[in-house]
C-alpha cells in the first residue's frame, strides 16, 4: 500500500467553498462530501486539523459601515457557525471531532490550547480551529499558517474554487498560465492570490509546503498522497 506523503496536515477551507455554488450559507452536500473525504484520509493514518473561513456568512474586509476590527470579529463568529456545522457532520459519520476556538466560548467549543490540540490529533481526532487567530486584521489564511507551525503540520492543503495558482485570473484571462510549482517568494513578489502575504511569509519562514487545489471529489486524498494535483508552493520543487 502506498504511504501518504503527509502524516499531519492542516486543511484550509474557505467559507465560500462551504457555501457551494451560491457561496452563501451552508451547502450540506458540500459539507457531506468533505466529511467523506476526511474519513478516507483518516483511514490512511493521516492526522487532520481544519481551519475554516467565514466568508459564506460575513467578510470583515468588505464591511464598509463599521470599523475593521469589529467587522473582523464578526467574521470570526461566522467561522464558529461553519466549524460547528462541520463538526456535526463529521461526528454523524463516527469521526471524533473537537472544535477549538481562539476566542473563548466554553459552552460550544474548547479554548485553543496547543498541547491539547496535538494530543487530540495523536488520538485520531479531527481538530477544527475556529475564530482565526482571535485577533482582528489577521485572515484565516494566516491562522492556518500559524496553527500549522504550532502543531508541526507537514503541509497546508488549501482547498479553493480554482484548480491551482495562475499568473492571472483564469476567469478573466483565457490564456492564464497555471503553475504546477511556484516558490513562496514568487507568490509574494507577483502578488498572486494564493494566501495573503502575511500567511505566505509565515509558511516560508517555517518551511511549510502549501498545496493549492480545487475542492472537488477525491482531491483532498490526492493532495495528502502527494499526487501531482493543483499547485505546490514551497522553497524548491520536490514532486
UniProtKB/Swiss-Prot annotation:
What keywords does the record list, in alphabetical order? Allosteric enzyme, ATP-binding, Cytoplasm, Kinase, Nucleotide-binding, Pyrimidine biosynthesis, Transferase
> Which CDD domains does the entry link to?
AAK_UMPK-PyrH-Ec
- Which residues does the annotation say bind ATP? 12-15, 55, 59, 166, 169
According to the record, the protein's activity is controlled as follows:
Allosterically activated by GTP. Inhibited by UTP.
Gene Ontology CC entries for this record? cytoplasm
Its Enzyme Commission number? Answer: 2.7.4.22
Q: Which GO terms describe its biological process?
A: 'de novo' CTP biosynthetic process; UDP biosynthetic process
Q: Where in the cell is it found?
A: Cytoplasm
Reactions performed catalytically: UMP + ATP = UDP + ADP
Note the subunit structure. Homohexamer.
Return the protein name: Uridylate kinase
- State the organism named in the record: Caldicellulosiruptor saccharolyticus (strain ATCC 43494 / DSM 8903 / Tp8T 6331)
